[in-house]
């Protein structure tokens, strides 16, 4: 049988590296359909760090899309597993027949599902993408995203699957010894990307708690973001005293990021779509509750796993946050479906579906 090809169609180094390492470490040894990749972006040592994989790199979205389309047309038995997507040319190829529905399997990462950009180019493209998405062979996504997708594409098959967040399962049972009293520390956003709506989030936190909490804003990723970081910092200083505002402009290594998260009492995420699952997982693992926008469908996944969820529309205070911490501490984190290694079973099933081994 023709080997399944995995496609990382946009140059998002952090996520692409996570996916490649997960496949190299957890899937490649047991499945021949977990080894072939086409990636938009630079190698930057990925080939050396993922020796179990065969990875072909392309300088950009356009060249990658052209190569995928050529392979799809040359062999209609060739199947592709698209991780995230973010590549307009591939959507247009699916819509026009360059890639057939039977060749197209898509793991939704969030951004290609929601229509949040206001630019004219995007508004013109969204209806075409919506039509193309009706032709996907099967989508894989979180419970919330599956529900969202099914509202407009009820005939497309959907299967539960979680992004392979880098986690250490041994930390699931580690007690968080942080003092749960006194001034609270609140994490705002999961990166420096504008989709986090940092300024609106800072205003919302201030409206709920005033200048009585310490706010930490991680903005070290993406790079070359200095102007926006300064914009957020100045907006924050209009709301919070200097001692209560910490805007991080440097990218943190994983262990340092983990240490930062464990110093927090609450995560605050105002964005209205599913994103930042990795940060949510690490916070939950550390016993730290999260505030979500009610429009963010990931709350469905959290409640399905019996996790407490706070919403941006709730009246929040320290007592409510402490109660959510208590509830979270009582959850057996080894049973959470979107934690490592539990999500591995979903990936094994996804490969079987994409290759036709499971109907």
Curated annotation (Swiss-Prot):
Pfam families named in the record: Glyco_transf_56 (PF07429)
Entry keywords, A to Z: Cell inner membrane, Cell membrane, Glycosyltransferase, Membrane, Transferase
Signal peptide (from-to): none
Gene Ontology cellular component list: plasma membrane
Pathway(s): Bacterial outer membrane biogenesis; enterobacterial common antigen biosynthesis
Annotated InterPro entries: WecF
One of the record's GO molecular function terms: 4-acetamido-4,6-dideoxy-D-galactose transferase activity
Lineage: superkingdom: Bacteria
GO terms classed as biological process: enterobacterial common antigen biosynthetic process; fucosylation
Compartments where found: Cell inner membrane
EC number: 2.4.1.325
Topology with respect to the bilayer: Peripheral membrane protein
KW Membrane (keyword) present: yes
Record's catalysed reaction(s): beta-D-ManNAcA-(1->4)-alpha-D-GlcNAc-di-trans,octa-cis-undecaprenyl diphosphate + dTDP-4-acetamido-4,6-dideoxy-alpha-D-galactose = alpha-D-FucNAc4-(1->4)-beta-D-ManNAcA-(1->4)-D-GlcNAc-undecaprenyl diphosphate + dTDP + H(+)
Primary location: membrane
Family (UniProt): Belongs to the glycosyltransferase 56 family.
Function of the protein: Catalyzes the synthesis of Und-PP-GlcNAc-ManNAcA-Fuc4NAc (Lipid III), the third lipid-linked intermediate involved in ECA synthesis.
NCBIfam families xref list: PRK02797.1-1, PRK02797.1-2, PRK02797.1-3
Protein name in the entry: TDP-N-acetylfucosamine:lipid II N-acetylfucosaminyltransferase
């Amino acid at each position: 049988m023709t080997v399944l090809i995995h496609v990382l169609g946009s140059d998002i180094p952090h996520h692409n590296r996570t996916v490649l390492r997960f496949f190299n470490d957890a899937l490649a040894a047991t499945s021949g359909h977990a080894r072939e990749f086409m990636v938009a972006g630079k190698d930057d040592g990925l080939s050396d760090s993922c020796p179990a994989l065969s990875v072909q790199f392309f300088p950009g979205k356009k060249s990658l899309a052209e190569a995928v389309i050529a392979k799809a047309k040359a062999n209609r038995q060739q199947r592709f597993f698209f991780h995230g997507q973010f590549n307009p040319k591939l959507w247009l190829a699916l819509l026009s027949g360059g890639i057939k529905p039977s060749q197209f399997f898509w793991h939704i990462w969030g951004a290609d599902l929601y229509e949040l950009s206001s630019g004219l180019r995007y508004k013109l493209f969204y209806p075409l993408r919506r039509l193309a998405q009706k032709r996907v062979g099967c989508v894989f996504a979180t419970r919330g995203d599956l529900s969202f997708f099914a509202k407009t594409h009820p005939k497309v098959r959907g299967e539960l699957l979680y992004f392979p967040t880098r986690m250490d399962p041994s930390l699931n049972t580690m007690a968080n010894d942080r003092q749960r009293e006194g001034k609270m520390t609140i994490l705002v956003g999961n990166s420096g990307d504008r989709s986090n709506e940092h300024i609106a989030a800072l205003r919302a936190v201030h409206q709920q708690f005033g200048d009585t909490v310490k706010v930490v804003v991680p903005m070290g990723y993406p790079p070359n973001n200095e102007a926006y970081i300064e914009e957020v910092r100045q907006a924050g200083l209009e709301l919070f005293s200097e001692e209560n505002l910490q805007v991080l402009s440097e990218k943190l290594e994983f262990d340092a990021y983990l240490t930062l998260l464990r110093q927090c009492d609450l995560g605050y995420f105002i964005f209205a779509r599913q994103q930042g699952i990795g940060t949510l997982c690490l916070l939950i693992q550390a016993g730290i509750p999260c505030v979500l926008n009610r429009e963010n469908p990931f709350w469905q996944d959290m409640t399905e796993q019996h996790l407490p969820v706070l919403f941006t529309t709730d009246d929040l205070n320290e007592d409510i946050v402490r109660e959510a911490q208590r509830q979270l501490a009582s959850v057996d984190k080894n049973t959470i479906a979107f934690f490592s290694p539990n999500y591995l079973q979903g990936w094994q099933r996804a490969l079987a579906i994409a290759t036709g081994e499971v109907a």
